[in-house]
Amino acid sequence: MGLFSGSRPDNLGFRDGKFAPPPWKPNCVSSTVVKDDKHYIPPLPYSGSAADAWKKLEALVAGLPRTHVVTQTGQYLYVEFKTATMGFVDDVEFALDEKTSAIQVRSASRLGVRDFNVNRERVERIRSAFAAA
């Protein structure tokens, strides 16, 4: 992959309604931590059909630049994003949560400590595009 790609994490997945807990580093956001946690970011709400919302998300994410879809099922999506400047790889997970009519999300940098809000801003851009689509 590249000098700044790092290794794929071994704790990926959505189990018991949660993603893996964020590391101590501030370079991760997750919708499945408690709301007062510094890593918290709200999930992506949807209305209407869960299947339609999921298809919309899959299409949106697949069209983003520097994106590699690794795992895609009917309720879980794992994507590697490569940053524009240095080519750092970030791991982003989405899970369809029909109980809450939301898509849960976790975005984390593989390397380094700080990400200068890259992961949070990416999720917010996806949220805006998802709401507008």
Language model features with spans:
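Ser/Thr-rich, low-complexity intrinsically disordered terminal regions
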Residues: 1-133
